[in-house]
């Protein structure tokens, strides 16, 4: 047996049977001689009309006890899969009446004892995957802080970061194939699309400010993590309170303040637009400007770049409707040549906002 948890453009995909008023993930029995993954592909196509999709196996599960599809009660096994559907045919050739795209999981399940547990398992495994790749980024920043010194080229810092990301488990970089966006000095106010990014020939000075933004991925699971690093008297200053340059110190303190305010302000019901307006006003009230070239403050974490939605005006989607989102204010004092950035990935555990 195969069950396929699936999504399309960030929405859950469920099927409604012609003879029931309940919803179910697509799935079905393996036919004689059929590979179980081929079963999953066939059932997905038949029950949802999917014609373009990526599918992968998640785990094997077992069911014990008598039920509607197992009259003997002997232990049976199934393959749990996940599919990202890019295109539907619009036609169904099976017992399903229709396919429904949902922001939230349904309450009226066809198989309430098993499918919610399978989705819970998928989400648990998914969270572990995202946590692992994000940890890769965090470890890379910790590593590079120990390496950075005056005289280093930004290009060398970029390559060291990208090499470390790969050593720690990344297999590629999701943002325009660049693993580390590195700026220093007066370039830290630069905001540019990754498509146009070129690492400059700058060299780290004895007193300097560096921003590093990492974008590792493994499979199609993304990490996204950025920090601002201060070098004074030739050494990285890891404690904000010990930074001697007051402008740099205040900039990093403001980044901390913004992320603290995020926890205070948002709920699952907060929209991306509401967060955009609130935080941009908060930035201005504290004497800073938003440097982002698009004016936004973060985005959803998805599997395809073009599917991202942003913390921007006119985005009415709720934060709780996405699995993960980034908060990455890129700020500066008015008329200053120095910029600051701190980026984390966040998600809701129930009603509580949590940093990944």
Question: Which residues fall in each region the model found?
Answer:
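Acidic, metal-coordinating catalytic segment for phosphate/diphosphate chemistry
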Residues: 1-3
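Short, well-ordered beta-strand micro-motif
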Residues: 6, 80-84, 101, 230, ...
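Conserved Nudix-box catalytic region and its N-terminal flanking loop in Nudix hydrolases
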Residues: 7-46
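Short loop segments at secondary-structure junctions
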Residues: 9-11, 84-89, 104-105, 233-235, ...
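Short, charged/polar surface micro-motifs in flexible loops or helix N-caps
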Residues: 9-12, 20-22, 86-88, 185-190
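"Short basic amphipathic alpha-helical interaction patches in structured regions
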Residues: 28, 95-97, 225-230
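Unchanged
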Residues: 31-54, 61-122
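Active-site neighborhoods and metal-handling regions in enzymes and metal-associated proteins
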Residues: 125-356
């Amino acid at each position: 047996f195969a069950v396929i948890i699936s999504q399309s453009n960030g929405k859950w995909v469920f099927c409604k049977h012609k003879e029931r008023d309940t919803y179910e993930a697509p799935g079905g029995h393996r036919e004689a001689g059929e590979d179980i993954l081929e079963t999953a592909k066939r059932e997905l196509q038949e029950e949802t009309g999917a014609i373009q999709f990526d599918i992968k196996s998640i785990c094997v599960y077992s069911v014990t006890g008598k039920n509607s599809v197992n009259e003997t009660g002997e232990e049976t096994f199934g393959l749990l899969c996940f599919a990202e559907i890019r295109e539907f045919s619009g036609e169904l050739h099976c017992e399903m009446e229709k396919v429904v795209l949902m922001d939230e999981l349904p309450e009226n399940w066809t198989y309430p004892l098993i499918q919610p547990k399978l989705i819970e398992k998928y989400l648990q495994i998914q969270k572990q995957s995202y946590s692992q790749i994000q940890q890769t980024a965090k470890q890379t920043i910790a590593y590079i802080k120990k390496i950075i010194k005056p005289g280093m080229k930004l290009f060398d810092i970029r390559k060291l970061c990208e090499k470390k990301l790969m050593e720690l488990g990344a297999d590629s970089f999701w943002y325009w194939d660049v693993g580390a966006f590195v700026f220093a000095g007066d370039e830290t106010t630069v905001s540019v699309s990754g498509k146009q990014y070129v690492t400059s020939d700058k060299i780290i000075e004895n007193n300097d400010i560096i921003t590093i933004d990492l974008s590792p991925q493994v499979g199609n699971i993304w990490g996204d993590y950025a920090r601002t690093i201060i070098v004074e008297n030739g050494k990285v200053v890891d404690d904000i309170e010990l930074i001697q340059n007051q402008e740099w110190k205040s900039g990093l303190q403001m980044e901390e303040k913004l992320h603290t305010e995020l926890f205070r302000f948002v709920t699952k019901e907060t929209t991306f637009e509401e967060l955009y307006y609130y935080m941009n006003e908060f930035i201005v009230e504290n004497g800073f400007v938003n440097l982002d070239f698009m004016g936004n403050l973060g985005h959803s974490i998805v599997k395809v770049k073009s599917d991202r939605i942003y913390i921007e005006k006119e985005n009415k989607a709720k934060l709780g409707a996405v699995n993960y989102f980034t908060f990455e204010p890129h700020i500066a004092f008015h008329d200053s040549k120095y910029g600051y950035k701190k980026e984390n990935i966040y998600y809701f555990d129930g009603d509580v906002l949590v940093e990944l």
